[in-house]
Amino acid sequence: MCLAEKDLTWEDKFIDLATNEHLTPEYLKINPNGVVPTLVHENRLVHDSSVICEYLDDVFPDTPLSPKDPHARAEMRAWMRFHEEVPTIAVRTPSFNMAFLPRFQGLDEQ
């Protein structure tokens, strides 16, 4: 979303979580934690959505997404952290169960 808001061009690489593509040796080379997203910019890697957004604001300052006022910027960061820590975690277990539990039903304990 930040790339689009800054009117930047980019190349998407879809990572299929359902097939564990994020756990392949190829993907783990660019993100050892096996999570998405990862930004590759000028052969450098940037992980984590919020960090990527702040990085893009630093590298491409012509269309700023962050407020200039330090207090407003702190509030923005607080909301970004809230988004990462509260709703993301709250939906992780139900989302995992809906997406992956059917694959495991009927399997024996081996």
Please annotate each region the language model reported.
Residues 1-110:
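GST-like domain detector, emphasizing the conserved glutathione-binding G-site
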